[in-house]
Amino acid sequence: MELNGLRVSRETQERLQHFAALFQKWAKTINLVAPSTLDDLWNRHIADSSQVFQIHPKPVIWADLGSGGGFPGVITAIFLAELQDGWVHLVESNHKKAAFLRTALRETNARGSVHSSRIEDAHAEIGECGAISARALADLDGLLEYSAPWMLGEKDCRGFFHKGRDYLREIDKARGRWEFDLLEHSSAVEQESVILEISNLRRLV
């Protein structure tokens, strides 16, 4: 099996397939993603989320903010299971979604845990991390504010944020409040979309 042109092991493929089946089951009763995207679950959500680990395939500690239906946090945790190292802390305040995330992690033997708390309170629970991820959560300025407890003054902590066609406007807005190093990774799944890799975050105002 390949995702975004990269080979995926049989074990990881089986975990992803089991996650997809669980997701479809739970999505009948919980609004995990926009219903219009369920028919394209593999490409729109699983392959898209896989890009984060494919960009940064290292066994680090992740904080996945506003995890929702598990994208990209559960997908990253599934890839880490193959490495048998690293961990994903999934932060989701909605208790029904948090229950789904716990079930998904347990049944796929993924390397992660769920914190059903507000993002603003999560740093005290999680501690330091090597990477932050978020998808469909907030604009870049908001994401940097959420990520600041982990990233400010931590040169080795990187943020990986999915963004759509308006990402340049979001970058311009964020530069009014923050300084940061930026790498733009073009999406292999969505035309005009990117994953923004942020490091060396500094607050201006």
Curated annotation (Swiss-Prot):
It is found in: Cytoplasm. One of its GO terms (molecular function) is rRNA (guanine-N7-)-methyltransferase activity. Keywords: Cytoplasm, Methyltransferase, rRNA processing, S-adenosyl-L-methionine, Transferase. Its EC number is 2.1.1.170. Disulfide bonds: none annotated. S-adenosyl-L-methionine binds at G66, F71, I119, E120, R135. It catalyses: guanosine(527) in 16S rRNA + S-adenosyl-L-methionine = N(7)-methylguanosine(527) in 16S rRNA + S-adenosyl-L-homocysteine. GO terms for cellular component: cytosol. It holds the Pfam family GidB. HAMAP family: 16SrRNA_methyltr_G. PANTHER family: S-ADENOSYL-L-METHIONINE-DEPENDENT METHYLTRANSFERASES SUPERFAMILY PROTEIN (PTHR31760:SF0). NCBIfam families: rsmG_gidB (TIGR00138). Belongs to the methyltransferase superfamily. RNA methyltransferase RsmG family. Specifically methylates the N7 position of guanine in position 527 of 16S rRNA. This is Ribosomal RNA small subunit methyltransferase G. It comes from Rhizobium leguminosarum bv. trifolii (strain WSM2304). The gene is rsmG.
